[in-house]
Structures are given as C-alpha cells and as structure tokens.
C-alpha cells in the first residue's frame, strides 16, 4: 500500500512550529521523519509565503505563525491558519 499523509509536510511543519515556537529544525525533522535539509526548506517556504516569521533569539530562531492569514486552499479560503491549527493543537494536548 502507498504511504500517504492527511496533511502535507508543510502543514505538519506548521503544526510543529505552532506547538513549540522555539522548536529546532533538527527536532522538526526527527518528529516528522524528514531530513534537516527538508525541514529547512519547508520552513523557508512557509516564511517566504508569509505564514511564519523567523526571529533570532540568541543563537537560535523562534517562529511566529501568522494565524490570521487565510488558508491557501480555495475550498477553505474563509478559514484562517489559526482556526485549523487550534484543531490540531487541541488534539495534541489531549491525554
């Protein structure tokens, strides 16, 4: 059977960042089973698109998800990033 994911890698990285704004690229990669290079590229894509802002915090980066922005999908354009993230973050917080 073909392996697939409900969320794209970009969506999964966005959830990781929303859960922990100080998360390291190494930790994103390890938790999602991707390379650090892929994590770096995806975070760069999200930053270029304006969905994530990168801020230096000493030697590390902190990320700010722009939750007010609409989803890029046309079928869900009336929803914001924050509304969708709340669903995934609430599910993650449950024991």
What is the predicted role of each segment?
Residues 3-10, 24, 56-79:
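Short, cationic-aromatic polyanion-contact patches
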Residues 12-15:
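Pre-recognition alpha-helix immediately N-terminal to the DNA-recognition helix
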Residues 30, 47-48:
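Alpha-helical residues within the helix-turn-helix
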Residues 43-44:
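Short, hydrophobic-biased segments on the C-terminal half of alpha helices
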Residues 70-95:
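Amphipathic alpha-helical dimerization/coiled-coil segments
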């Amino acid at each position: 059977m073909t392996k697939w994911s409900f969320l794209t890698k970009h969506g999964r990285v966005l959830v990781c960042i929303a859960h922990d704004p100080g998360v390291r690229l190494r930790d994103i990669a390890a938790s999602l089973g991707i390379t650090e290079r892929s994590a770096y590229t995806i975070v760069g894509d999200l930053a270029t698109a304006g969905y994530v802002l990168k801020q230096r915090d000493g030697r590390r980066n902190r990320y700010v998800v722009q939750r007010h922005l609409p989803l890029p999908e046309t079928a869900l354009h009336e929803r914001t990033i924050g509304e969708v993230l709340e669903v995934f973050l609430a599910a993650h917080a449950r024991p």
